[in-house]
């Protein structure tokens, strides 16, 4: 299935982002494939959905946070989490859960601290999904 692999190229990882999110990592897809009962076609379909649906949700989270609408940011973050947990529940999914908690508590400091890490992690997962589809 996924044979290509690239290194992190010496990039420093962010403290809150697991190292597996900083380079193409076939093990992310191996775990997802296991959760999907080995159905590679379904994995690719879900990857395509993630690739298409992530940008507007990320924009929605960012815009809602910037405008102080934490309820809307929470809803978009929840939808974003639903897209990523099949692929990476312990990385992206966990970061988004932490962001959702901060949004629910309206903890501005934590929201701003976590939002960048979440977005970076989700964008990296999206990039990996694009590679899977190539």
Regions found by a protein language model. Give the residues of each.
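Two-component system phosphorelay core
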Residues: 1-134
């Amino acid at each position: 299935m996924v044979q290509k692999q690239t290194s992190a190229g010496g990039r420093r990882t962010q403290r809150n982002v697991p190292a597996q999110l900083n380079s193409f990592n076939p093990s992310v897809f191996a775990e997802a494939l296991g959760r999907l009962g080995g159905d590679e076609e379904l994995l690719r379909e879900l990857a395509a959905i993630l690739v298409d649906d992530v940008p507007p949700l990320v924009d929605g989270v960012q815009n809602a946070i910037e405008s102080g609408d934490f309820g809307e940011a929470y809803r978009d973050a929840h939808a974003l989490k639903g897209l990523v947990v099949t692929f990476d529940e312990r990385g992206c999914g966990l970061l988004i859960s932490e962001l959702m908690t901060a949004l629910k508590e309206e903890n501005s400091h934590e929201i701003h601290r976590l939002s960048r890490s979440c977005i970076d992690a989700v964008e990296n997962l999206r990039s990996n999904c694009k590679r899977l589809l190539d």
